[in-house]
């Protein structure tokens, strides 16, 4: 288990007198860490905590960003295994939290590749994040191309693919809308896992124009 406490550095009292009995930030964070570690006394959680982190986030966006990350306990990552491949997971890695259900989902997608006669087929994994899906498709495909706009995620994908011994994965950092105009390969199958705001309206016609049999 990797746990992150996210707080803001902004003063909630804004110069006013704090409510009597309220905790300062340091006391709150220490108490949070101690409470979690005390849970390890429960045999069900013994040895389960890989790390505990404190993230300071002053952004007003609806997603967590790190202005500062402090490691309170353990390490900043852990390893998860899916369908025989190992992935290094950190706080900001996008990874399915229910790994058992994820395996069923990913195996189904991999079976689609196999049904295409996958050994010489090309798969596009668009909005690929840290490349989890792309790498899981790689053993059944000739080549997998992942496209992701976040450069840090692309670097993580490359490292995980190398660690898994996969040499048929290519990860490209860039906007799907623009990258599709630059990639020469044509896909036999496309996997889409876009962010919350969905697929760019101008990218969708380009994806459809590939006229592939399977879009997952």
Give the residues covered by each predicted segment.
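Carbohydrate-binding surface patches
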Residues: 2-11
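Rossmann-like S-adenosyl-L-methionine
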Residues: 12-216
């Amino acid at each position: 288990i990797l746990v992150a406490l996210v707080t803001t550095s902004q003063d909630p009292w804004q110069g006013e007198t704090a409510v009597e009995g309220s905790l300062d930030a340091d006391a709150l964070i220490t108490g949070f860490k101690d409470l979690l570690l005390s849970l390890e006394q429960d045999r069900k959680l013994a040895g389960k905590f890989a790390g505990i982190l404190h993230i300071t986030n002053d952004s007003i966006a609806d997603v967590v960003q790190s202005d500062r990350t402090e490691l309170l306990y353990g390490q900043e990552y852990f390893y998860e295994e899916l369908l025989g491949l190992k992935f290094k997971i950190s706080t900001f890695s996008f990874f399915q939290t229910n790994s058992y259900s994820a395996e069923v989902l990913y195996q189904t997608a991999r079976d689609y590749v196999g049904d295409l006669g996958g050994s010489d087929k090309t798969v596009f994994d668009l909005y690929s994040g840290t490349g989890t899906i792309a790498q899981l498709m790689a053993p059944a495909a000739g080549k997998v191309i992942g496209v992701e706009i976040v450069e840090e995620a692309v670097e993580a994908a490359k490292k995980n693919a190398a660690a898994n011994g996969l040499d048929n994965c290519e990860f490209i950092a860039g906007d799907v809308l623009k990258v599709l105009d630059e990639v020469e390969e044509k896909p036999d199958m496309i996997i889409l896992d876009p962010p919350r705001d969905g697929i760019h309206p101008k990218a969708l016609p380009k994806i459809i124009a590939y006229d592939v049999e399977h879009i997952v």
